[in-house]
Amino acid sequence: MTTIVSVRRNNKVVIAGDGQVSLGNTVMKGNARKVRRLYNNKVLAGFAGGTADAFTLFERFESKLQMHQGHLTKAAVELAKDWRSDRALRKLEALLAVADETASLIITGNGDVVQPENDLIAIGSGGAYAQAAATALLENTELDAREIAEKALNIAGDICVFTNHNHTIEELEIPAELPNLSQA
């Protein structure tokens, strides 16, 4: 599988992921890009799960973003509705972590949309390790979002055999006047 982590702190939100693609117990590729910018570079998205499935979801999610003028939550809910009702989509095995200036969300394979606590998302095979590491770093350091995501991925990569140290990191600056809706 893989590890994707998203951290929101101060005026930044980051989504980062490793590059390993595995088929069973074999590493097939080490430099896959599982984190992307969508909707005119205003939305970050990362996936864990089947690669082909994730690309299908990226395309569907981006079309929902276009349809809803970039409104992240509306697009995520509409994708989740499709995911639940479309027979082909229901068979897709992937998780999406998405974020923009205002919110961070997980879109699950069951068609659920979850807004996490503590401005932190960690999904995939190394997600629990990355979440534990990022939580400790958020609570006990002044590191910025990018540094926390990077360190959390490194720790997950040291522990999880399906996570490597070839990272893709995307970052958005959050304008100071925007409220942090995830703490509302």
Curated annotation (Swiss-Prot):
Activity regulation behaviour: Allosterically activated by HslU binding.
GO MF entries: metal ion binding; threonine-type endopeptidase activity
List of catalytic residues: T2
Top-level lineage group: Bacteria
Pfam families cross-referenced by the UniProt entry: Proteasome
Subcellular location: Cytoplasm
InterPro entries, per the entry: ATP-dep_Prtase_HsIV_su, Ntn_hydrolases_N, Proteasome_sua/b, Proteasome_suB-type
Name this polypeptide is given: ATP-dependent protease subunit HslV
Taxonomic path: Bacteria, Pseudomonadati, Pseudomonadota, Gammaproteobacteria, Vibrionales
